[in-house]
């Protein structure tokens, strides 16, 4: 079951002062929201897995076609191949094989999980005016000063969501190991949940409303 929620934010300018207000209307899950968020997180985590682990069975290991000794009369245990899983250098029983760990999740469910996560993070979300025009060249110090004006702690993870990635902004933020920059159309559940604070530009907020509120 989904319910409509309206999130009201104060908008901060580059100097750290309140310059206006912004609203975000979201359809979020009321009952099973965290279950959907968990499924979306598992899906994204699984898609990062390479899935290339591979072992050889006794039929794939080189050699072992000849019976190592006769069946009876040697006093030793009977053996049919030196590549038996019981032998050193033999095949592996039920070992891993290359596989895909991808889990299926409907687009509507994924979007609902994202909206629910955004709603849950609303207390730790800061809306700011677009700041691309301040970066005429890459300058990390410029962004750090803005972070301090917005009263954010760089010792904790900060997620910055912009309308589209500006090369100068991206290069300025890249040096900060606790800050991640993503565009609104590549919003993902893992980045949202990992962030302690979320910064969203005004244009990115409009794009989130447009793209994910289906």
From Swiss-Prot:
Residues 64-75 have a biased composition (Basic residues). GO terms for cellular component: chloroplast; ribonucleoprotein complex; ribosome. Part of the 50S ribosomal subunit. The keyword Repressor does not apply. Belongs to the universal ribosomal protein uL4 family. Probably binds the 23S rRNA. PANTHER family: 50S RIBOSOMAL PROTEIN L4, LARGE RIBOSOMAL SUBUNIT PROTEIN UL4C. GO terms for biological process: translation. This is Large ribosomal subunit protein uL4c. Residues 42-81 are annotated as: Disordered. The keyword RNA-binding applies. InterPro entries: Ribosomal_uL4 (IPR002136), Ribosomal_uL4-like (IPR013005), Ribosomal_uL4_dom_sf (IPR023574). One of its GO terms (molecular function) is rRNA binding. It comes from Pyropia yezoensis. Keywords: Chloroplast, Plastid, Ribonucleoprotein, Ribosomal protein, RNA-binding, rRNA-binding. It is found in: Plastid, Chloroplast. Its main location: plastid.
């Amino acid at each position: 079951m989904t319910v409509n929620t309206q999130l009201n934010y104060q908008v901060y300018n580059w100097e750290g002062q309140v310059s206006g207000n912004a609203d975000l209307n979201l359809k979020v899950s009321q009952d099973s929201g965290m279950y959907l968020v968990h499924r979306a997180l598992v899906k994204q985590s699984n898609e990062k897995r390479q899935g290339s682990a591979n072992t050889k069975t006794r039929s794939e290991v080189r050699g072992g076609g000849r019976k190592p000794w006769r069946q009876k009369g040697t006093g030793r245990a009977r053996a049919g191949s030196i590549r038996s899983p019981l032998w050193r250098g033999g095949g592996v029983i039920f070992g891993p094989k290359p596989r895909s760990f991808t889990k299926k999740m409907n687009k509507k469910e994924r979007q609902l999980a994202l909206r629910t996560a955004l709603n849950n993070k609303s207390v730790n979300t800061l809306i700011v005016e677009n700041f691309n025009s301040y970066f005429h060249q890459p300058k990390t110090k410029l962004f750090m000063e803005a972070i301090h004006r917005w009263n954010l702690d760089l010792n904790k993870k900060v997620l910055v969501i912009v309308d589209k990635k500006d090369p100068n902004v991206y290069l300025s933020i890249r040096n900060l190991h606790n800050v991640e920059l993503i565009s609104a159309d590549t919003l993902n559940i893992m980045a949202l949940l990992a962030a302690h604070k979320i910064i969203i530009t005004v244009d990115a907020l409009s794009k989130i409303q447009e793209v994910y509120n289906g």
